[in-house]
């Protein structure tokens, strides 16, 4: 500026806070050297973001800085904190056990003061473990963990009565129970779970659930979720709930032949054991209004649950992929007959022939009636209108759905032209 006037320093403090919250913590602290006006601004910025030891010369110097700053900000006289972010992504800091202990201590220091806490430790190694997940905070509302190893037998967030959102991405989640009386939103993505035991999820106030493309292990066992409104579940080829004998019911083989069935209801040698005459997963989703259930063709858990399929009394929108076409489309028929107020059904079909299996379906259709008189539209999204689509149209019309209610979206009609959509009027 020609006049040399410092207009930035003249801004209100809340505006300065909005600018500084975009910077890592060490750069925020350095602003105290800019001018007299800036000397104390860093002390009241409502966010802290630590970006790892890179550039500090040594991990010890970085650790000393974090220790001192957390002492100043999280002590009794520190200004309130909206959020604290520890981002150690790919800087190597967590490779040393001593630094893992530092991270656990910092988490405990920040926890009582913040409303949102994020810990990110993504490196080319196993997830870094947290020494203790028995957390206590009267203020924490959101917790995000990335690349963290959780090995407690029970993770109980009763000590965080205001926690409403928990997100875990690329984590090792080797726990038997996940409990919280307050949690409303749970997201577990690309994580590792046990191949021998399921996570019992007991969250009476849960509103939304996302369990997406976990890299190992079994789908959780869902307790009662009376407030659940929406769930998105994507099970890929790494899900351990598969039968090596291609059966939807248990093949009865021992662990040398089929781990998928042998450990389906828990480790017979150690437990816990789940009720063999009840759902593992679908019953916990029965209160939802919006469901997306996608699975690799080898995954059996959804089809096994159909034997005890609950009635989805509130379900209005449903998305399924190819897994529902196995065993004479029994899963598709089952959902149609157990969703009395369903308004919209979406079927996302992959390329390739109709999924065939020698296994007999567990669910036996209830005649040829369809439960929902509320159904407005069925959307079929496919690469090509082939025999698979024709078979689905035949099934849908057999169970009372009119062709004019069905919309087919063909995604590969002309390369680069996007989606081709049409409403069915006839098929042969």
List PLM regions with ranges.
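Non-core capping and flanking segments associated with repeat-based/extracellular domains
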Residues: 1-428
